[in-house]
């Protein structure tokens, strides 16, 4: 029997994922300004807001899953906590799972009628996101918020 190494390794101490086919994207304040009600005059445009690690599989079968990690910095913009870009999924059948790895924050959820609610995130909490809900993360603490994510490829 052939034994191989895992394609991906999540480094829990460093808050990152290493390995094959890992895409890393960075969101700076300049790219995130539209997420906030007011601009943060004292915040440089190149301030790192969050990093996303995505583990891609090599095929596009509908049943396949993506795995990722979002690492949010403890940054405030004009007294608003750091947030990710909120979004609806194109396919409402695509649910998602979030697992809070480190830190504290909120998972904001909104239905198609604009009704909102939030779930507290803390280390070890597991959150199911219905595919029909828009969602975004909020880092409410003074340390990094690290959230593992699993969602369908489509």
Where do the protein language model's features map onto the residues?
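Active-site region of the double-stranded beta-helix
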Residues: 14-120, 140-154
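Loop/turn positions that initiate beta-strands
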Residues: 122-124
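Histidine-centered metal-chelating micro-motifs
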Residues: 106, 126-127, 131-136
């Amino acid at each position: 029997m052939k034994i191989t190494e895992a394609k991906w390794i999540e480094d829990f101490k460093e808050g990152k994922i290493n390995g094959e086919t890992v895409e890393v994207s960075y969101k700076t304040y300049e790219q995130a300004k539209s997420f906030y009600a007011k601009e943060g005059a004292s915040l440089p445009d190149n301030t790192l807001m969050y990093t996303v690690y995505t583990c891609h599989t090599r095929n596009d079968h509908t049943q396949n899953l993506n795995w990722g990690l979002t690492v949010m910095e403890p940054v405030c913009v004009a007294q608003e906590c750091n947030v990710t870009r909120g979004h609806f999924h194109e396919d409402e059948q695509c649910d998602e799972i979030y697992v809070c790895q480190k830190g504290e924050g909120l998972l904001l959820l909104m239905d198609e009628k604009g009704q909102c609610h939030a779930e507290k995130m803390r280390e070890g909490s597991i959150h199911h996101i219905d595919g029909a809900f828009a969602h975004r993360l909020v880092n409410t603490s003074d340390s990094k918020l690290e959230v593992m994510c699993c969602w369908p490829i489509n």
